[in-house]
Swiss-Prot record:
Keywords: Acyltransferase, Amino-acid biosynthesis, Cytoplasm, Diaminopimelate biosynthesis, Lysine biosynthesis, Repeat, Transferase. The keyword Cell cycle does not apply. GO terms for biological process: diaminopimelate biosynthetic process; lysine biosynthetic process via diaminopimelate. Homotrimer. Belongs to the transferase hexapeptide repeat family. This is 2,3,4,5-tetrahydropyridine-2,6-dicarboxylate N-succinyltransferase. One of its GO terms (molecular function) is 2,3,4,5-tetrahydropyridine-2,6-dicarboxylate N-succinyltransferase activity.
Amino acid sequence: MSLSALENTINTAFDARDTISAATKGEVRDAVDQALDLLDRGEARVAERDASGTWTVNQWLKKAVLLSFRLNDMHTIAGGPGGATWWDKVPSKFEGWGESRFREAGFRAVPGAIVRRSAFIAKNAVLMPSFVNLGAYVDEATMVDTWSTVGSCAQIGKRVHISGGVGIGGVLEPLQAGPVIIEDDCFIGARSEVAEGVIVRRGAVLAMGVFLGASTKIVDRETGEVFIGEVPEYAVLVPGALPGKPLKNGTPGPSTACAVIVKRVDERTRSKTSINELLRD
């Protein structure tokens, strides 16, 4: 089925989603399965960047991911600790893989790394014990460090370092219009959180513990400019706070969390955040 036919079939099915179940057969199931396979192989992406830097969301692919939950029944998944099983609708990306398939894929997945089917992992990526949800895209030479999560349909660029315990939000619940996007050469510090469709532009650095959502103010302390929903290229962010409005009784109100751009990336920053090629051999 062509991409345009896939898109039309999935859009129509999504509008009639209340009629779809695990018993549904035929064109709709075939279209969703094909769309998920394209995502899994990296031949289609939920969001794509054009030459001008504008990201376009392929909403029909996101709809395909959502429809798969209606189409697929629960089943046991082997591999739990102590011979236990899990109970879910989405199989592992690695189900049925052997040595040759991993060598062909060209990335590292250490014990404890969980990737759900329809997520794409590019060559030379490194997955420590982490979780990559369905529909996500993790590009070449990116490190997803221990206990980090890459949410549904999130788009992670090349040579990105996602430090330990980072949360990259998904789009499925609560339902978001667009995925979180981390562009090439970014560094996301430990225990940071990027959610609600925020875009982190190329080369930006988030210090440890930066929390960004759709309404978080990002304040450039040099210029006073305020950004919302997007981190500028090569910005270095740290956690901050804005003074709150006085309360009705005149006492100072609580401050509001924000992120602060303290500088742009320089050579000193690069030396601290550059990736280690030895880990990707």
